[in-house]
């Protein structure tokens, strides 16, 4: 599923291609690209849930969290998110790339991946996908993009 998500993100979003594609057309294109139908369906459902998450009632309890409060991870989150991943999420929040709401959406989407162990690179791409889909997060998306691509180009600040 993650390979399908990466393909979609790089093909349609990061390349500024036409994002308004019919689901059947998209499914056919992904099948022609060699992806399994089940994996395509999982990825499209993952994206649909992402699109719906920022409109949910999550904002009510996230907005109520106090400034400077610390996120405590549930056992199932600790099992899937390494110390490195949790530390990077904290860094992104402290750098104001993520806020409490986008952090929670990222964690939700990460746990929905069908990967037993979530790696730091997986987290970075999911953060970019989340920020791209949350209205008003354009600056945060640009900051995250710079973090991801500067690091992969070997540029150290």
Swiss-Prot record:
Belongs to the Smg family. This is Protein Smg homolog. It comes from the Bacteria. The gene is smg. Transmembrane segments: none annotated.
